[in-house]
Amino acid sequence: DPQEIKQGGDTGIMITSSESYSKPSSNLSASRKGNFFIGNAFFKQPWVVAPASTDSRDGLGALFNVAACQSCHVKDGRGHAPMTAEDDADSFLIRLAMPATTDKQRQQLKDSLIEKVAHPMYGGQLQDRGIQGVPAEARIAVQWTDKTVTFADGHIETLRAPTFNLTNPGYGAFDDEMMVSPRVALPMIGLGLLEQIPDEAIKKQAIKTNNANSDISGKFNWVMDPQTGKVALGRFGWKAGQTKLITQNQSAFN
């Protein structure tokens, strides 16, 4: 509701600590809060290699990015890129894609039947860890270069520009034409509310910003819903590549 003072309405909480993203909505019933805390426990605890005594969260690997959801979404907030070339990419990942080379692939992309053309060996997302005895697909390294920017009023600011490198490929050399897309883990707050926004409201907002000739504009993204097999409005992820929370979660587990 544009007139709502609180962005989250009755779900909002009045906590401003580092734990504020990790609290249940204030209007949850007691039973729903119980569901929240069970889910939150799974979110924080690491998955382990099967077989294991903790069979409710075994099955890690063989390749993976991190062992726990919380490792990427620290305190349910935004992640960060590695600070140095030696740092692990704990809350950061690399998406992969190849150029479309056939008429079928080009048509599938045009019709939103596929998000991208995945790499034939490494798939659509690089996994930089493996269980014991399984080589990781590669190591993600970053180098930062200072870049000076001068604003219109003469103010000078120094920004950092990253260069990402994929080293130690575990399953064959990378193709020269392979495209990479660095992604920082997104915050978890408000995703349930985002799922409740009607499609028409999102479309209307995109049209409104584009017609305003402003510096900020957007367009809605059509993607294939794997549950229905139909093209639907994307909502989740940096590029709105998932239609529902359940498919976003499934993608993160895959």
Residue ranges and their predicted role:
Residues G39:
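Basic, ligand-binding patches in group-transfer machinery
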Residues D1-G8:
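Bacterial Sec-dependent N-terminal signal peptides
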Residues D10, M14-F36, K44-N254:
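Extracytoplasmic redox metalloprotein regions
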